[in-house]
């Protein structure tokens, strides 16, 4: 597994924060690093496999990666993101208590993936741009200023996370997408789901297309297919059982969609024939 080292990203030993844009981020094999990072997705779509679990990410997704986590990107489509790197929650020169603003693991569950709406994403971009504009300056004032901006970023993300009440269509769409990650196997009636999150069906179609480039059904199928591929790789269940478990009522239709999405059949994945590309 590839290991990324802080010495390659932090310009000087005194630096505590670094910015690494990926415009776009292509598929990248599984890796981990000896630093922490916050991944901010600006646009496009892709699959983020985090500690073995696949997540569909798009504009507004925010991912919190710790130094012992492993992750990879695949199936990317114009995925543009910015990585905000920091050495560790307790490795700042002028900040204390940073961990209180970060996701907290509870009973083995680490809420690593958040979403913010487009308005907040613009504010995030502004803060990151200020950090990036400072370049590699390492004098005391520059380090302090960069850490202040990092704290502003954390506070903004925390306040804007899904724990906040959905008060506009962007926030409601984000909550709907998070709900789909947990309920993808259910029979979905889009009119009912849209109403559940106080969205009109027309608004749902328009905003999801803008944020992910996909229609609601295409997005749902992609989530289902990603979950199915994970099970094919990491379980002994039959292809038919996995198809039904992931929300497909017909295993032949599932196999057709699967091959169209990944250029491999479910049997190929089960037998590891795609491993050479991983």
Curated annotation (Swiss-Prot):
NCBIfam families: PRK13503.1
Coiled coil: none
UniProt keywords, alphabetically: Activator, Cytoplasm, DNA-binding, Repeat, Rhamnose metabolism, Transcription, Transcription regulation
Domain HTH araC/xylS-type: 174-272
A GO molecular-function annotation: DNA-binding transcription factor activity
DNA bind region: 191-212, 239-262
UniProt site positions, description: Interaction with sigma-70: 241, 250
Keyword Chloroplast: no
Functional note: Activates expression of the rhaBAD and rhaT operons.
Highest taxon listed in the record's lineage: Bacteria
Gene Ontology terms describing biological process: positive regulation of DNA-templated transcription; rhamnose metabolic process
GO annotation, cellular component aspect: cytoplasm
Name of a matching Pfam family: AraC_binding
Quaternary assembly: Binds DNA as a dimer.
The protein, known as: HTH-type transcriptional activator RhaS
Organism the protein comes from: Klebsiella pneumoniae (strain 342)
Cellular location(s): Cytoplasm
